[in-house]
Every structure is written in C-alpha cells, then in structure tokens.
Amino acid sequence: MSKIRTRYAPSPTGYFHIGGARTALFNYLFAKHNNGEFIVRIEDTDIERNVEDGAENQLYNLKWLNIFADESIWNPTQSGPYRQSEKLEVYQKYAYQLLEEKKAYRCFCTPEELQKHREDLLKQYKPPIYSRKCFLLSEEQIHKNLADKIPFTIRLLLRDNKEYSWNDLIRGNLIFNTSSMSDPVILKSNQIATYNFAVVIDDHDMKISHILRGEEHISNTPYQLAIKEALGFKDEFVYGHLSIIVDETGKKLSKRNLAVEQFVEGFRKKGYLAEALVNFIALLGWSHPDNIEILDLPTLVKSFTIKNLSAAPSFFDIKKLNWISSEYIKNMDDVMYLAFIKPYVDLNEYDEIKTKVNEICLMFKNQLQYGYQINEIIKESFVPHVGLSNLDQADLDFLKSNPNYRQLLISFKEKINQLDQVNDHNVKEIINWLAHQIKLGDLVLEKPLGGKNLYMPLRIVLSNKKHGPELNKVIALYDKQTILKNLDDAINYLTNAK
C-alpha cells in the first residue's frame, strides 16, 4: 500500500475558521495515525477576495495548534509549488490539452446571458443546467469570436448520462449522474483555473491519497471525478465528507454570526490553551471509542480512526469548550500555569495588591476557562482601593445591624497587630481562633455570632465585597498597615454610629 498523504487546502479569503481547523486536524490525525504525511497548500486563485495575510494567518494558527505540516510554503519539497497562484501555467496547459482533445470547449456566453438562462430554467422548475449553446458553435463562428477577441471560458464536456460514484468514508456509497450536472468551467476568462479543476491537478501532482473535507464539497466531487477521468489521471482518491457544524439553534454555523466566536485567532487572543481547543475541535464529529473526552494531541493521533467519524451534525457547544479548557488549566502544574496566565493579568488599577500577582493567579486557577477571564474575575473580586468610602448604604446598615460586629473587628485587629507578617495561613488561624472563642463563649458578645455573621463583616470591611475567594487569602493580599487602617476606620464608624 502506498503512503497515506492528506492535505488541508484553505483559500486565503478569510481567517482561520473553526471549521477549517477541524478539517486540518482530522487530515493531520488520519495521516499521523497511519504513519503518513500531511500537506498544507494555499488555494489563492480568487485574487479579488484574497485577504492580504490570509495564508500566513492560516499557517501561523496551525502552528499554534501544534498541527505541523510535512510540506507547505514554509517547508516545500519537489511536490510543490504550494500556492495555486504559482501554478497558473500548469493549469492552463492541461485546460488547452483538453480543448485539443475535444474533451472541452470554449464558452463565449456572457455572465448576463448565463444568469438569464439560469433564471429562465428556474422559473420553469427545471435544474439550472447549461444549455451547451457554445458547444454547438461552428468552427467558423468560433474563429470569428476569437478574431473579435470576445472573452471566453473553457468548459469540460461531460459525458451524457454518465454516473460518477464513490464510497465515501463517512457517508457510504454516493452516486451522481451527469444528467443533473452542467458542463463545468475549468478555465475562467482571465485564464485562471477554477477550484474544481485546479484541485484535481494539485491532488494528482502531490500524490494525495485521502481527502477529508466539509459536507459542502459533496457536490464538487462528481465534477472532480469527471475532470480526473478526462485528464487520464489514474489516482484513486479516497473521499470522506465531514458533518456540518451547527449552532445552538441547530442552524449551520455561520461566519456572519458575530455573536459566536468562531475563529482560531479569537480563541488564541482570549487565552484558550491550544491543547484544549484541539481537544474540543476533535470532538466535533468524532468520538473516542471509549467515550473519553479529555484527549491530548498524542492520544488523539493514537486513537483517531475513520469509523468513529459521524455524518450527523456536530453541535458547536461553547460551554463544552469552556469545560475542556478549565480541565486543562486545572491540570497544569503551578509553574506552567503562572507562565501561561501572568501575561493576561492587568492589575494597574489595583495599587494595594498589584505586587501579589502570583497569589492572585493561583487563587483563581480552578475557576478559569481561558486566560483573559482572569481580569473579569479580578474585577468581580476586588476594588481598586479598599476603604469605608466604597461601601454603599446597605453595607453600612449591615455593619450597624449587629452590635457584636464592632467587637469582632476589634478582636480581629488585636490579633493582626500581633503579627510580624501577614499571610493567608496566620490570617486563617486568627479567623479559626475567633470562631473557636465565640463557640466557647470566651469572646464576650451581646448576641450569638457565627457562620455568615462571622465572615461577612470582615469581608465587607477588608475587601469591600460580599462574595469572593477564601477570606483569609483575600485579606493576606493587603499589607498589615492597610488592613489595620481599614479596621480602624470601620471600628470608629461603628463607635460613632451608636
């Protein structure tokens, strides 16, 4: 059996979409599982729609995902070129060869004529199949049109009532008859090859064996088989068409839906781990034979088989991505985690705690789903400057609601004052001591005090928040002087409020 060679062939007309990432990943996994080779080539013949850095964006983000091509514009071999724009003469040679062999013909129809013909057929509830008007032109008329420099395309002449079929790796046997197909344009009037024509030549030149691609390419396949046949290529391309990816409403995921992040670049900038994103993408239409869901790239390579691909629509579930991502973050050791998360942290507004970056990052490790989320959580958990002036009337009323709160703050202040250095361990000991003293009755209080009534006054006074991480860890972020000042301010307020 010859070596398995797969390919990912994006058009640089946009940035790296999650659907393209899945196509690339599945081709990569299939090749590597079978000790084969994975090729990336750029289909850049749609000059008007090409994005300036589209090709580089695709390759850069593939590299970020750790999907490395054995051959590409970055590491070419003799199978290249890897940009279609560098093979225009090759495509032209093949197109004119088919013209000479009477397997193709010139079409002088204008876009307006073709559009009208299409509309007329649709009004008659007929399939919009080209009429072959130009195939019926006489040699004299063709020569006259050429002499008059009338623009033309080249169309492949399909065989009448010919069936093209293939055993799709995912969908089984599929059959198309040329009675429902138009003679396809293979060379446009600007002498640039069409997608279907160029892709067959590229797959042949690069010795591609297996082609995994999106469901939308099913209708292209019979045309490509017809082109392959006309060119006399003996390649036995094996096709597999992946499931569509749908959103939460069941509709096909649309790039126009800006409410849903769909581009790899966006996930990278938000701080998703590449390993987590690859893991998530792999589960869009494929499942592990043992239904395992946390799978790193080596495990995916080892486990990936075609039989576990599904033709059913794949649900793009951002909640599942966030869960997978959080699992990867939790499983990082602290050194790796800090190296990952610290570049995202912005504590510029938080002067009192901005030197405690490591402590803050570790505090939220088990809550994070992606890197940039750390700032959202910081904003929810802290205020830029802790002080009595930040408290709203409801907070102040709460502090005044129980006469024991003042004594609690005084006792806590006395213990903090005795410390040489404040850290989360000795703060926790003080909180536990207070709870124990209250339980034993050694702390003189007017009313019973415990649970929420023990922690809430301290949290409000020392963090200005009602909820947040473990109280001892929050308090320990601040220096001793700041803690004592905030306690004094609250005690004085409650003393004067009596």
From Swiss-Prot:
It catalyses: tRNA(Glu) + L-glutamate + ATP = L-glutamyl-tRNA(Glu) + AMP + diphosphate. It comes from the Bacteria. Gene3D superfamilies: 1.10.10.350, HUPs. CDD domains: GluRS_core. SUPFAM superfamilies: An anticodon-binding domain of class I aminoacyl-tRNA synthetases, Nucleotidylyl transferase. GO terms for molecular function: ATP binding; glutamate-tRNA ligase activity; tRNA binding; zinc ion binding. Pfam families: Anticodon_2 (PF19269), tRNA-synt_1c (PF00749). One of its GO terms (cellular component) is cytosol. Its EC number is 6.1.1.17. It is found in: Cytoplasm. Its main location: cytoplasm. A motif ('KMSKS' region) lies at residues 252-256. Keywords: Aminoacyl-tRNA synthetase, ATP-binding, Cytoplasm, Ligase, Nucleotide-binding, Protein biosynthesis. Catalyzes the attachment of glutamate to tRNA(Glu) in a two-step reaction: glutamate is first activated by ATP to form Glu-AMP and then transferred to the acceptor end of tRNA(Glu). Monomer. This is Glutamate--tRNA ligase.
